[in-house]
Structure formats: structure tokens, C-alpha cells
Amino acid sequence: MAPPSTFDGVRDGLVDVSFVTASYTPARHVLPKMPELTGGGATAEINSVAYSRIHWKYFQAANEYKGVKLLGVFTHGPGQIFTVKKAVNTIDDLKGLKVRVGGGISEELGQALGASPFVKPSTESYELLSSGVADGTFFPPESIKAFKLEKVVKYGTIFPGGFYGSAFGVFMNQEKWDKLSKADQDAIMSVSGEKIARMAGQAWDRADHDGMEAMKAAGVTFIAASPQLIKDVQAKAAVVEQKWIKDAATRNVDGAKALAEFRQELKNVAAGK
């Protein structure tokens, strides 16, 4: 099953349970784009827990996961820019850059920055980068190791809090869920919601650490995004952010309010609240 078909596969009963990034289905999953915006928290755990709180408070009622039993949501670690032939030091370095992206906000952000993003599943990244079809990719460090890209990428431009994020849903076929006993349902729900968000975030943070170590061992050069680059990206990202707020309104969600509360929750979670 191709990754973008995961949601339909679970809904239609081809598989019982799975998880997948909402970036693959941006038309269906508009609200999960929120934690993908530039300016997230320092870790996957922080982002995941904050996003989970906002989802269940504001987004669940929009029913974007209609047809499946949603167990939880989470995010991957702070996404960064990885390239093969040249480093990204300034916003001009992004212009015309052929970048593999997962879709959603990462695609919109790439377009806003003047790059040439194209959507392909993460599983095709090695072939795309090694063959020169793609000049780079937007990924968290975890994915570099997972897809053996430390053998291909030469540069990583690192943004505090990430250049972008990616939201995931964990869901089960509704009929399979309905057939479970109440005791089994309760057991599953006891580790779902915010608990699964925190666990998934912690696991991704460990994998991001391993990814960074793999890249260091492979000799990948890391560039800390300069204050000017961060400022330039934020200016372009503001347009993407405003578009998401307008799109959220089509789901009867006050996007500005939800986003402001999400950013406050990022601070709360980072402070241990």
C-alpha cells in the first residue's frame, strides 16, 4: 500500500490500524497543517503534546478523520533542510532548489521561498537524491538515517524549533474497533490521546538523536540558520500561516485562536506543564 493510501486502507478495512502523516492528504486534513508551520518547539515531544491538546480541544469536532477511530495525534521532530551539492546559507540559496517534500505545509513553504518542491513519498527519497532528480529534501534527522540518506546528503541547515513540522494521526478501522470488548477499548484508550502523543514524541526524539549522530559520522556539514535566514523564512512563512488560518475557517475553526493557543502550549509543555 502506498503511504498516501494509508488512511483509505484503514477506513476500508484493508488493514486494521496504522499511522501516517496528514501531509499526504492535505485536501482532506486541513487542520493538522497547524503544527507543520514554521516556529515549533525544540523537540518532537513538545510539539506532539501541544498539538494533541489543541486537536482534541478544537479540531476533533471538525471530523477530518471521519470513517476511522482516531486514537491519537503527534508530530515528527523539528524538520530541517538537507541538501546534496550546496549548503543553504541564505534565502537565495533556496531559489530553484528541487526539493522532495511530503506535501502540505512543507510544499507550500517551499513554494513561498522560491524553491521547486515536489511531492513524493519518503520511501523514494534515496533514489531521488542519489540520482540528482532532487537537490535536497525537507526532513527531520530521524528520516535521514531511516532512509540511509547520510550516504547522500552533504549539508544540513538547522533551524531552532525546526524549519517546518509534520503531523501524524494514529487510527483504527471503525468496524474492528466496534467489535472490541469494552475492556479492550478502555485499555487502548488508556494509552491513547495525550499519552500516545508523548510516547511517540519521545521515541522520535531518540530517533532524531540517532540520525544526527549518523550524519556526524558520515561527515555531513551542519549550518546553523543565521538570524537573517530565520527572519527571511519567517517573513515568507507568514503568508503560508495566514492561508492556513483562512482554510481553518472552512472547517468552522478559529485558526488564529487555535494557533495562538498552540504556541502557548508549546511553552507550557517545555516548562513541564
Feature annotation, model-predicted:
Residues 1-46, 56-273:
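N-terminal secretory/targeting leader peptides
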